[in-house]
């Protein structure tokens, strides 16, 4: 029996995945977590074989949660299940040790295949993600994203700013003081060589970190 832990900050997504996997022979969802912190706690208690990990979550995001999880429990297999198809997310998560990467648009059959494949010691990457990574490997490296210089927390805050969240809103969601959020904000500006939230939003759109419509 393959024990699975589902990690996503949206209740409907967690519940939907759990229900879909309930009738699959050989799989058992042993728990659900809505943030990285709970994922790490439940993983210690439940000892799952496979963790289905979202990327963008309040508090500890999927990237940092994957790093910490595999540092303490290296035998666990992490499959990233997310809407984040554009680099640097796939590259960063795979470098952090994720065994699989798939989009939330995938069907049940693909998800089951991914779980069984990583449990067997192989990797699984959705076809569209694999094609994107393959194409990138042939591109000149000088076009790497400036966001590659940011930490996981800095990327999390940068994306929230780019999506028009104010300092107080970010402070409330991440349980940080406004002063700490502003410290991160100016550090992000310095690393990206920008001076305003508008420039950050434009840079994020240009490098595929957020949709232009948002």
Swiss-Prot record:
Entry's Gene Ontology molecular function annotations: DNA binding
UniProt entry tagged with the keyword Kinase: no
Residues recorded with modification 4-aspartylphosphate: 54
UniProt cross-references to Pfam families, sorted A to Z: GerE, Response_reg
SMART domains for the chain: HTH_LUXR, REC
Ranges where the Response regulatory domain occurs: 3-119
Protein name: Response regulator GacA
Organism in which the protein naturally occurs: Pseudomonas aeruginosa (strain ATCC 15692 / DSM 22644 / CIP 104116 / JCM 14847 / LMG 12228 / 1C / PRS 101 / PAO1)
Taxonomic path: Bacteria, Pseudomonadati, Pseudomonadota, Gammaproteobacteria, Pseudomonadales
Gene behind the chain: gacA
């Amino acid at each position: 029996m393959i024990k699975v832990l589902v990690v996503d900050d949206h209740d409907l997504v967690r519940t939907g995945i759990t229900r879909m996997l309930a009738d699959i022979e050989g799989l058992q969802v042993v728990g659900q977590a809505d943030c990285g912190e709970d994922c790490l706690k439940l993983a210690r208690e439940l000892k799952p074989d496979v963790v289905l990990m979202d990327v963008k979550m309040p508090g500890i995001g999927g990237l940092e949660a994957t790093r910490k999880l595999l540092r303490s429990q290296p035998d666990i297999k992490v499959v990233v299940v997310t809407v984040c198809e554009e680099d640097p997310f796939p590259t960063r998560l795979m470098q952090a040790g994720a065994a699989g990467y798939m989009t939330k648009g995938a069907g049940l059959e693909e998800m089951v295949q991914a779980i069984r494949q990583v449990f067997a010691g192989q990797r699984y990457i959705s076809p569209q993600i694999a094609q994107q990574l393959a194409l990138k490997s042939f591109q000149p490296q000088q076009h790497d994203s400036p966001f590659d210089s940011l930490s996981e927390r800095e990327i999390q805050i940068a994306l929230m700013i780019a999506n028009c969240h104010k300092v107080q809103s970010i402070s409330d969601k991440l349980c940080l003081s406004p002063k700490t959020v502003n410290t991160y904000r100016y550090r992000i500006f310095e690393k990206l060589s920008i001076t305003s939230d508008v420039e950050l939003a434009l840079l994020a759109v240009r490098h595929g970190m957020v949709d232009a419509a948002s």
